[in-house]
Amino acid sequence: MLDYFSLAALAAVVREGSFERAARALHVTPSAVSQRIRLLEERMGCALVVRGQPCQATETGRRLCQHMDRV
């Protein structure tokens, strides 16, 4: 089951390019964003974000972000 808050964290990281800026946009801590993404990656069984500066979505991450935009 994909939950809204995890998908929102993924979309924010991809949009903002960093966990820290995504956390500010979502009004949570960077560790909360990281934990949500990690749990989502575990559920999906693959990496969703390439960590770096800037953070970028993998192909699967991009598809999930597109799904999030439609929901």
Summary of predicted features, one role per range:
Residues M1-F5, Q56-R62:
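Short, basic-rich loop-to-helix N-cap that marks the start of a DNA-contacting helix
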Residues L7, R43-M44, L64-V71:
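Alpha-helical linker/hinge and terminal dimerization helices associated
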Residues L7-L10, F19, V49:
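Conserved hydrophobic/aromatic "anchor" residues
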Residues A12-H27:
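Short helix-boundary/capping micro-motifs
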Residues R24, E42, R62:
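Alpha-helical residues within the helix-turn-helix
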Residues E41-A57:
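A short LG(V/I)-centered, amphipathic sequence patch enriched
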